[in-house]
Amino acid sequence: MRKGYLLGWMLLASSVCMGAGLPQKINTFPITDVRLISGPFKHAESMDICYLLGLDPDRLLAPYMKEAGLQPKAENYPNWENTGLDGHIGGHYLSALSYMYASTGDEEIGKRLDYFLSEMKRCQEASGNGYLCGVPNGKAIWNEIKNGKIDANPFGLNNRWVPLYNIHKTYAGLRDAYVIAGKEEAKGMLIALTDWMLNTVSALTDEQIQDMLRSEHGGLNEIFADVYGLTGKKKYLDLAKHFSHRVVLNPLLEKKDQLTGMHANTQIPKVIGFKRIADLDGEKAWSDASDFFWHTVVNNRSVSIGGNSVREHFHKADDFSSMMTSEQGPETCNTYNMLRLTKMLYQTSGDMAYMDYYERALYNHILSSQNPVQGGLVYFTPMRSGHYRVYSQPQSCFWCCVGSGMENHAKYGEMIYASRKGELIVNMFIPSVLEWKEYGMTFTQETSFPEKESTRMVLHTDKSKKMKVSFRCPEWIDKSKVAFAVNGKKAEATLTDGYYTIERKWQDGDAIEMTLPMTLRAVQLPDKSSYYSFMYGPIVLAADMGKERLYGQFADDSRGGHIASGPQLPLQNMPVIVGEENNLLSNLKKVSPDKLEFALTGVYPSRYEGMKLKPFYQTHECRYMIYWELVSKEELGQRQKELAEVEKERAQLEQATADMVVCGEQQPESDHFVEMENSLIGSEQGTPWRETREWFAYKMKSKGKPVNAVRIESFSDAARDADVYVNGVKIGSVQGKNTLHTLLLPKELWKASEWEVKIMRGKSEVTPKFRAVRMILSKNLSLNE
C-alpha cells in the first residue's frame, strides 16, 4: 500500500510543476507518514473505523449495480440513498476507506477498500463505456445532456436530484483510492470515467455547460484538474475550465462578495476547483479569487467554531440575527470543504492565518461533529442558545454530512506537520508520530494539549543531522510566556514569520519541549452585534443547558431527520451577560488549573450565575450555549421585552405548524420532493423565494399534528396572483398585494396525513415570489391576514 500510495501522492503533489504552475512554499507530508497515538482525535479516528466497518458495502454498492445492469447483492440503504441521490454515499465511503487505510493501515479497512473498489470496477466494466455512478436511471439523463437537452436548477438537473453532485462523489472516491491509498486500478477507472464525461459533453457549447452548472455539481472542476495533474493531458485541464462556474468565479475575480443568498456548500467546492486549476496552470488571478473567497467567508461570514451559513445558505454578512435564532446553523460539509481550501492556500502562501483557522475549525466544528460514544455524525450545529444537535444512526441516515463526516475523522494527520527545504514544521499539537523517510528520522509528539499547555517532541535518527525544527506561533498564544527546552535545558528559539525555530545538530533521542500558554478571548460576531463567544487558546467554550426534550436527537431515516426539530427554548429565558465590553473577560474564571472548566459570572437571570463552561467538542447530547448576548443594565429590561414579543410570535407559529418548506432553499425543497415547470428561484436581501410561470408543488406531511389550513408567505407587486391546489382541489387564490395568506382546507382533507400543495399561475403571467408554505392548525392564526 505504501509504495503505491507514495507514487500517486507524489504525482499529484508534483504536478504543480508541470508547466507554469504556482509553486508550493510549504509541503505537507503523505498521510501514511503520520500516525495518531492518543487523545481526542485518536478516539474520533477509532470511532470512525467502527462506523465504516458497521456499514454493509453491498447495500452501498446496490445503486451502482442497478445502473450497471448487474444483480445487486442487497437492497439500497434508505434515506437519501433510495430517494434520488442513490450512490452518493458510495463515493464518500470509498474516500473515507482510502483515507482511513492510509492513516492507520488497519487490515479490515484495507480489505473493505479492496472489495468496494473491485465491485465498483465490475460495475464500470459492465457499463462498457467508462460510466460509473448510482444516479437512478442515469443513462437516460446523460443521453439527454449529450443531446443538448438541459433543464437545470440549483438542486436538480432534468428532473433528477443533483446528478452532477452525485457523480462528483464517485470521481472523488476514485481519485482518493489512487492518490491517497495507492490503489493503481483506481487511476485507470478515474481516467475512464473522465473520458466518459468528455464524450458526454463534447458536442455542448460553453454556454450550455455553464447553464448546466446552475445545478449543484460539487467540485468536478477540481477532479478534472487532478486528472490533468496525473496524466499531463491538456484535454482534462480544458474540461476543468469548462466546468468552472463563471457566475461564481467572475465576481470573485473582481473581489466582489455576492454570496448572500447562495447555497453555501454548493460554492465552496467550486472555489477549491478554481484554486486547483490555478496551482496547475499558473492562473494567479484564479488563486487570488479563491483567496478572496476564503477571507470573505472566514472573516465576514463565519462564527467562532469555524462554521458558516444558516439553513445551508449564506445570510447577509452584516446581519447574523438568523444565525442566533435558527435551529439550522452551520453545516458540517461546509467546514469540511473550507478546510480543504485552507490547506491548498496555506501550501502556496505559508500564511499563518490559514493554520489558525484550520486548527480552530478542526477542534471546534469537525471534532465536535462526531458523537464520542455512539459515533453518530452531525449535519447542523445551531448557534441558537439552548438548542441541540442531531446525530446520525449508521443504518438509517445517509445525508451529505454523513458522507463528508466519514472522511473528516479519517484524516486528522494531514496537517499536523509540514516541511520546507529540509526544515520540519510542527503546525498542531496533537499526539502523533511522523516518519520522515527522506531524512531517515522519526518524530514523536507527546502532549495532552489542550488540557496541558505544553508539548514534547522526541527525535530519532540514524545519524546526527543539522536542521531547523520550527513550531507554529498560534494567534492565541501568550508570546511573553513561551519557553523552549532541549533535553531538559533551556533553549532559545527565533520567532520569524509566525514560527519559532531552533536550528542545531540533532542527535538520536533528543527531546524538545515547548510551553503553550493559552490566552482567554471574547470573540464577537463579525456583524459587530452584541453576541460573544469565549475561547481559551484555540478552544471554543460552551455551556451545557440540560437534556430537556431532545426530540429526534438520534435521527431516523426521514428526509428531515437531520434537523433538531424539538422545541426551541424561549430566547428571553436564556442567560445574558450584564456589563460592558471592556470588562467582559473578567466575568470568566478558570475553575481548576488541571481542567478546562470555567465559571461565568455577571449573568442574568441570577439562577445562571456561575454557570460552567467547557470545550464545545466535549459537549454532547444536550442543549448548549456558545454565544452570550452582552447588555448593559439600562438595556436589559427593554431587550427582554423585545425578545419575549418575538419569541411569543415564533412559538405560536411553531405550535400551529405541522410541516413547513422554505421556498427556494435547496434541502427543504428537496426534502419535500419539489416538482415544477417553468419556475425560478432567487434571493432578495438574503431571503430566498420561488416564482413560476406555470406551477410548482411540494409533498407535505401532518407528522401526527392536526391540520386544517395552508399558510403561505409571499411578496411581489400587486399585479401578480396565483391559485393554490391541495390534492388536486383548488382551495383559493393569493394576490400579490398581500404577504400572508391563510387558506382553509376542505374538511375532507383535514384528516389526511399527506398532501400535495400545488401553486399555479393565475391570471398574471407570473406568480408572486413565495417565501414559505406551511401546513397549520389555523385556530392560532387570524384568517384575515
Regions found by a protein language model. Name each.
Residues 138-161, 187, 191-211:
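Asp-box/WD-like beta-propeller blade repeats and closely related beta-sheet repeat scaffolds
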Residues 21-107, 111, 142-180, 217-235, ...:
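Aromatic (Trp/Tyr) and acidic
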Residues 124-125:
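Extended, charge-enriched "interface" segments that sit outside catalytic cores
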Residues 157-158, 203-210, 253-261, 321-330, ...:
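Active-site-adjacent structural elements in folded domains
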Residues 489-509, 515-529, 678-707, 711-780:
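Beta-strand-rich ligand-recognition modules
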Residues 290, 355-364, 369, 373-460, ...:
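C-terminal beta-rich recognition modules with glycine/proline-rich loops and embedded aromatic residues
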Residues 1-21:
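Bacterial Sec-dependent N-terminal signal peptides
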Residues 469, 482-484, 722-724:
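Short beta-strand elements bearing conserved aromatic residues within extracellular beta-rich modules
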